[in-house]
Amino acid sequence: MPKCPKCSKEVYFAERVTSLGKDWHRPCLKCEKCGKTLTSGGHAEHEGKPYCNHPCYAAMFGPKGFGRGGAESHTFK
């Protein structure tokens, strides 16, 4: 019986969601930053952890600079 990577409890077939090559409980598959519940294949991954595509993954790991949502977007020089 596979174990959920988030809570380490056994994942039964009826409650299983497969994502990132692992079996999760549906409520355990959440964005690491904001906690939003994610759907299988409808999210991004960084170092084996799930993130919602927008805004969390884009803000944390996307391109930085003017107009990209990074720290420099709102800096006037």
From Swiss-Prot:
Gene Ontology, cellular component aspect: cytoplasm
Residues with PTM N6-acetyllysine: 9, 22
Protein's gene: CRIP1
PROSITE patterns on file: LIM_DOMAIN_1, LIM_DOMAIN_2
Protein name stated in the entry: Cysteine-rich protein 1
One of the Pfam families matching this protein, by short name: LIM
Gene Ontology BP, a term: prostate gland stromal morphogenesis
Alphabetical list of PANTHER family matching this protein: CYSTEINE-RICH PROTEIN 1 (PTHR46074:SF3), CYSTEINE-RICH PROTEIN CRIP FAMILY MEMBER (PTHR46074)
InterPro entries assigned: Znf_LIM
CDD domains recorded: LIM_CRIP
Role according to the record: Seems to have a role in zinc absorption and may function as an intracellular zinc transport protein.
Modified residues (Omega-N-methylarginine): 68
All residue ranges annotated as the LIM zinc-binding domain in the record: 2-63
SMART domains in alphabetical order: LIM
Protein species of origin: Bos taurus
UniProt GO MF annotations: peptide binding; zinc ion binding
Keywords: Acetylation, LIM domain, Metal-binding, Methylation, Zinc
